Curated annotation (Swiss-Prot):
It comes from Bacillus subtilis (strain 168). CDD domains: YqgF. It is found in: Cytoplasm. GO terms for biological process: rRNA 5'-end processing. Could be a nuclease involved in processing of the 5'-end of pre-16S rRNA. Belongs to the YqgF nuclease family. It is an enzyme of class 3 (hydrolase). This is Putative pre-16S rRNA nuclease. HAMAP family: Nuclease_YqgF (MF_00651). The keyword Hydrolase applies. Disruption phenotype: Not essential, it can be disrupted. Keywords: Cytoplasm, Hydrolase, Nuclease, Ribosome biogenesis. Its EC number is 3.1.-.-.
Length: 138
């Protein structure tokens, strides 16, 4: 069973993939999107879901620190419905508070340049979201 992990931004969609055993998450790519125009990179997601025979999607669900759902969380809820309808696979909304910040700290600690960090931060956040979900299962 393969699971896809996603980190939704306004301009990019970070993508991670579980191994077949469901133990580890690996970053796949960052898809350029345009949330304002409703372009969520669905054609590329379709390819990934078909190529890897995806059984489930874990989508980062950003909540405010007090647990309430703000505008970004609402965007994730809307996107989750689009994914479920389009691909007919279950979508799990996973609390992603601070994952992007944690990913950035890891990249800074690894001395990754600001330019390179910008390219991989969403993919790294998707890995952290998916790995958190996988760890909760095992």
């Amino acid at each position: 069973m393969r699971i896809l992990g996603l980190d939704l931004g306004t301009k990019t969609l970070g993508v991670a993939l579980s191994d077949e055993m469901g133990w580890t998450a690996q970053g796949i790519e960052t898809i350029k999107i345009n949330e304002a125009e409703g372009d969520y990179g669905l054609s590329r997601l379709s390819e990934l879901i078909k190529d890897y025979t995806i059984d489930k999607i874990v989508l980062g669900f950003p909540k405010n620190m007090n647990g309430t759902v703000g505008p970004r969380g609402e965007a994730s809820q809307t996107f989750a419905k689009v994914l479920e309808t389009t691909y007919n696979v279950p979508v799990v909304l996973w609390d992603e508070r601070l994952t992007t910040m944690a990913a950035e700290k890891m990249l800074i600690a690894a001395d990754v340049s600001r330019q390179k960090r910008k390219k991989v931060i969403d993919k790294m956040a998707a890995v952290m979201i998916l790995q958190g979900y996988l760890d909760s299962l095992n």
